[in-house]
Amino acid sequence: EWLLAFKHGGRRELAEFFAQRLHERVTLPEPGCEPPLLVPVPLHRWRHLARGYDQAFLLARALGEVRGWDCARLLKRVRATRPQGSALALSREANVRAAFELRRSLGRSLQAMLDGRSVWLVDDVLTSGATADECARCLLRAGAARVEVVVVARA
């Protein structure tokens, strides 16, 4: 109920609540290791305009504030897709194939941010994992050492 209010009900302030829960739940990197870069799963611009905010970005930013870690919008959704929750399991992968790419505007700084670094891909809900897999492929191709997925809930 709270997650639906956050995702669809305009309750942006719940990002801090969910970030605190994630902070308590997830395993920290080994001492002395560079902290991971937090990267939100992006919304398509049309969905962002309709909703008025990007809940994954709000969540990633709030988690970054709790942990003192960097959050960067490195990915862009270049193709509108159906919500994964409404897609049949077999079509979820096809639904998000080639739907994401790295933001070109970041140029060389993108390589410096990602080169050999661990990334936590942040989203509100994990359905089949197809969206996370597609985003992870983009980040790994760009030089991330590893990508871990951090979500509030699984559907």
Whereabouts are the PLM-identified features?
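Extended interfacial segments that mediate partner engagement and assembly in macromolecular machines
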Residues: 1-66, 73, 82-89
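PRPP/pyrophosphate-binding module of the type I phosphoribosyltransferase fold
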Residues: 34, 70-155
